[in-house]
Amino acid sequence: KEMTDDKTYNKAKTMENTLIKGELKKLMKNTNDWLVDIGFGEENLAVFTLRGQSPRETYELGDNLRFFVEKVDRGDEILTKDKSGKTKKKKRGVKISLTRSSKEFVKCLVERQLREEIDNGSVVIKAIARQAGIRTKIAVDTKKSDTDPVGATVGKGGCKIQSVMNEIGGEKIDVIRYNEDPIVLIANAL
C-alpha cells in the first residue's frame, strides 16, 4: 500500500504546474470545493477549491474541464501500527490542488495555443496580470525584429486568443506589447 502511495505521489508530482483534464465528481457542500477525477482513482481525487474557481464560470457534476495543477502533497496523516505494535503517523494518498483562476492557468493555455510561435521566438510572454472572471492582461515581446508579437498572439481575426477566452468562460484578454520602461508598459496596458 505504501509503495502504491509513493508511485502515485511521484507520478502526480510530475504534473505539478501543468494543465490536465478532469471530471467534476462531487461538490463538497460545506466548502463549495469540488472533488475531481484526474485518473488516479477514487482514493486520490483532486480538489478544485472555491478559491481556484472563476467567478464567471458555473460548474456542474460531470463537467470535463482543463485545470492547472497548483500543488501536489502527500495525503492526510493517519495513525498506523508497525510490526512491533508501536503507533506511528504516516501520510496516506495524495492531495492534488487544482485551479482555473490563476494567471498560471491562463499562461499555460496561451503557451499551448502558441507553441510554434513561442518555440521559434516570434512570441515571448513577459508578464501576465489576471482578475479572474473579469480581465487578463498579457504583455508579450519577440526575439525577431520583423514580427509583431501582439498580432502573432491574437492570431488572424483574433482566432488564437479567442480560443483561450472560450476556455476561460469568455473572460476578456488584452494582449499588449511589453516594454522594460514601466511608464511605457503602463501606457500600453491602458
Regions found by a protein language model. Give the residues of each.
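RNA-contacting regions in translation and RNA-metabolism proteins
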Residues: 1-190
